[in-house]
């Protein structure tokens, strides 16, 4: 045992909770909660039957809780530093708009000529109009939480639910295959209804519709199954990693 090492504060709390003398864990080369959770619960109990006895399971559980809390705090601090650093860099590199815009300032009357006619009522002053319509608050919050992780919602579900056939192989299908594709699209539920609405046209030949609205002369929707083609013709941006085909026939737009 290295006598220069001392028990970590988190492990000291575990010692207090299970009522063992301070420094007991260090005698058995456990200096932090991470030394304990490197072993499975069963391994730890079996390896230390002689001294904590029946309290070994409780000691491992407490150590695991402390370790998880420390990991969460570490990740939160990392993310906070990353976001603050990006914001500070943006502010440092920004221009002084108050001085550079002299002579080109647009007054409020020009920018919002409707303000003079608005009534001071709750709807007028408190109504919030999202910049992205249709807007789905829960989906937007999920996307924001994953913004700095470079991981999609589909990736998270696929790692935790490997029983879904779609995640095992693209050639396999099942009840959840369509749901897996919806997760991969990064579109909110309301946005997903736009390209998947059924065709309500009574015309048998839709060539003129596709040429007028999407700029391609085609009798059916098949050219637009490729997401890049669909996005290019609509002049919209493909999300990062969105290079896969749409994959199902409901992609034809409603008319």
From Swiss-Prot:
Pfam families: VRP1. The keyword Coiled coil does not apply. This is 28.1 kDa virulence protein. The keyword Transferase does not apply. The gene is spvA. Keywords: Plasmid, Virulence. Belongs to the SpvA family. It comes from Salmonella enteritidis. InterPro entries: Insecticidal_toxin/plasmid_vir, Sal_SpvA. It comes from the Bacteria. Not known. This protein is involved in the virulence of salmonellas.
